[in-house]
């Protein structure tokens, strides 16, 4: 990956103050997306067709990737001269706030439906998985708000993360993943040749362990117990316990099945995102033993239109990692970034099939590394396979140090 990415200005629509965000009103799609399970239930009530229980599944894994293919990519950027104005425009932040009660509404209405309406096993499962997808993407809202410094924003992040029971993301992502990304120390960075299933077994427990350890260290410095209510991992966990206990009390024992299914599939959405966002990428280890500062080319990027519009621009992940506090409406594309072949929903689906995923991504990783296999994070035991596949020879002792 060439270094001119650090010096070339990003592409912009216009270098003047007359810039208009053409997607300004389209961002409402990110707000409406969490309501899709409710829309599906309305369609079931009006038509009697069970297929609508799986509306989110159909849209997420089918229609959205199709629209991404049809619409292609949007490379336009706001000129830097208007970014301060965009960042101060409350409209964009209000949209993120609005998604929070919608996530709660989708959860409560779905819980009410399965406990009061006649529903078969497959319909039950389809609704639980559909809810899991949109509530997994509550993590996306929590991601956007959790990077902000305002107390209100940070509490809104904790509230929305509580919906899917993944409150430790608030600490793990900001203080752990952003520090260690694209290094062997990061459980949320996948290795070339690693399947999503293998990745999940180290990413999910590794994320919680890192978050808890970071909070334990912070509270210790403040002279407080890790079990203090100041623990920002415990805070959203308590919210989840209260929320789920209330749902169980109101809607009965079916919640003991329904809630874990939607929660598990919600967690799977984050695992899928982490899996594709930095697959195989590696920051250079410097002579002093530290890793180079992360740059835009240490994240896979996607400019696909439809999926970005329902994900608050999450797929412009390269600029996000380089500038974590930059809001979604201001995120930029750069020249010469590592690029995913399609948007996140399509890549999430492909990731279910490891051979298919590797066939799409491994050549891209090698191209990113300019054919130098030593610049790639590779799954242990797979190095010889890739040396033979690409006809290259790596060093005898590649850096595979993993934090304990």
UniProtKB/Swiss-Prot annotation:
One of its GO terms (molecular function) is alkane 1-monooxygenase activity. It comes from the Bacteria. It catalyses: octane + 2 reduced [rubredoxin] + O2 + 2 H(+) = 2 oxidized [rubredoxin] + octan-1-ol + H2O. Fe cation 2 binds at residues 178, 317, 320-321. Pfam families: FA_desaturase. Pathway: Hydrocarbon metabolism; alkane degradation. InterPro entries: AlkB/XylM (IPR033885), FA_desaturase_dom (IPR005804). Fe cation 1 binds at residues 143, 147, 173, 177. Its EC number is 1.14.15.3. Binds 2 Fe(3+) ions per subunit. Its main location: membrane. Signal peptide: none annotated. Belongs to the fatty acid desaturase type 1 family. AlkB subfamily. This is Alkane 1-monooxygenase 1. The gene is alkB1.
């Amino acid at each position: 990956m060439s270094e001119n990415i650090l010096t070339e200005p990003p592409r912009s629509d216009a270098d003047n103050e007359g810039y208009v965000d053409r997607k300004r009103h389209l961002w409402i799609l990110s707000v409406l997306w969490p309501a899709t399970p409710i829309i599906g239930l309305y369609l079931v009530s009006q038509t009697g067709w069970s297929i609508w229980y799986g509306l989110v599944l159909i849209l997420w894994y089918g229609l959205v990737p199709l629209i991404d293919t049809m619409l292609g990519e949007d490379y336009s950027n706001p000129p830097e001269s208007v970014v301060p104005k965009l960042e101060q425009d409350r409209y964009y932040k209000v949209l993120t706030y609005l998604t929070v009660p919608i996530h709660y509404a989708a959860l409560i209405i779905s819980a009410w439906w399965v406990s009061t309406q006649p529903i078969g096993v497959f319909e039950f499962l389809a609704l639980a998985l559909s809810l899991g997808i949109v509530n997994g993407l509550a993590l996306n809202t929590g991601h956007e708000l959790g990077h902000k410094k305002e107390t209100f924003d940070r509490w809104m992040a904790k509230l929305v993360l509580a919906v899917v029971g993944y409150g430790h993301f608030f600490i793990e992502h900001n203080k752990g993943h952003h520090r260690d990304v694209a290094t062997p120390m990061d459980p949320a960075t996948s290795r070339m040749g690693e399947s999503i299933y293998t990745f999940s077994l180290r990413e999910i427990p590794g994320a919680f362990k890192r978050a808890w350890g970071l909070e334990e260290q912070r509270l210790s410095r403040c002279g407080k117990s890790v079990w203090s209510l100041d623990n920002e991992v415990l805070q959203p966990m308590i919210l989840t316990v209260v929320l789920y206990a209330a749902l169980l009390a109101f809607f009965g024992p079916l919640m003991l099945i329904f809630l874990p299914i939607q929660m598990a599939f919600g967690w799977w959405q984050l695992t899928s995102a982490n899996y594709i966002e930095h697959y195989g990428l590696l920051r250079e280890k410097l002579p002093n033993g530290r890793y180079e500062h992360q740059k835009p080319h240490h994240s896979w990027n996607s400019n696909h239109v439809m999926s970005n519009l329902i994900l608050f621009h999450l797929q412009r992940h390269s600029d996000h990692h380089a500038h974590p506090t930059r809001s979604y409406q201001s995120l930029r594309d750069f020249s010469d970034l590592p690029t995913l072949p399609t948007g996140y929903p399509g890549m999430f689906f492909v990731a279910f099939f490891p051979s298919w995923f590797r066939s799409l991504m491994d050549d891209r990783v090698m191209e990113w590394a300019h054919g130098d296999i030593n610049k790639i994070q590779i799954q242990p035991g797979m190095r010889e396979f890739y040396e033979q596949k690409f006809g290259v020879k790596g060093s005898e002792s590649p850096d595979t140090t993993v934090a304990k």
